[in-house]
Amino acid sequence: MNGKTAECENYSDWKDFCKYTAMQNAWSFAHFALEKSSAPEEVKNLLEQRFASVVGQQVRQEFFQGAIFDKLDENKIEYLPIKGSTLRALYPHPEMRVSCDVDFLVRQEDMPAVREALKSCGLEQDTSCVGADHDVWHAEGGVTIEPHKSLMSLTDFAGYFTDFWQKTFPVGDGSSRMRLKTEDEYIFLIAHAYKHFIHGGCGVKTLCDVWLFRKKHTDMDEEYVYTELEKIGAAKFDKKIVALADCWLGDAEMDEESEILTDFLFDGGVYGTDKSSALMGTDAESVQKTKRKYLLKRLFPPLKSLKLRYPVLNKCPFLLPVMWIVRIFDAIFTRRGTIKRNLKDCGSMNEQDVEKAKKIKEIIS
């Protein structure tokens, strides 16, 4: 990514390396970093196999993405590609940047027509994931497509993105594809990362996205970016993430804060863990209060969270207590593994975890 081959002559814990690579879904990164290194051949062979698998998945995604966007163009439906599909071009090799799904934004009033377009492309809607802000559709080969009606949800700053359509403009090639100016694209990148970070973690891909974005767009209006990020409380987070990215991929030296953030990002996987989400999501001063708040939040989630799982709450919010009971019984009969995992996470929390979470929040807030 930065043109360097990893130095690993004195490294020996390859089992741990592969574990963290899997947690971060970073097989492509690892493959390119180690293919010409002195890493053991069995490790490089494993990375090559995993790399071939994720590239195959990416090819399938791009096929369906192209078909869907062509159909939207044909029907004059404006759309804004977001997340991985817009960031891939920043990488030295596009196949380095893999995505779990294909995301794009459409206007809420266009969603019925978008659904018809997806059906005509051979996709099937996942009716168990009907949410307030996006649909989930599946295609053969394990491809997932997510058309969004809003850029952000379930955050205190979601309102900032309500009218983001006003900041879009046509790409100018005669299609219905829209784009954002560079600064607004970066603001969404940071806001999306910040949302995941404060809910448990955002993974190493985010650091790479930020570093490469800034490396390509050196002429951004930094005053505008800072002012807008201040509005959503993410300006300091941006500063710390940029500094950390420069430690990882540039020439900056790691300090104590960088080490703390690095450990948090690596341990959290792509989107963080339930445990880290619980620790980051409470302001409790003790481990017992943190555990209590965590269990209460798991048993009785707020209205905005359950709207995604139970769309009836959008029109009838007074049914929230009923949906709490429905959700509990649903978990008992269909998601016992989740219950066991949540109880295990709660039981493993200690004072050190609480102090670490407090330190991380101090660094970015």
Feature map (PLM): residue ranges:
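Conserved NTP-donor binding/palm subdomain of two-metal-ion nucleotidyltransferases/polymerases, i.e.
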Residues: 1-100, 106-365
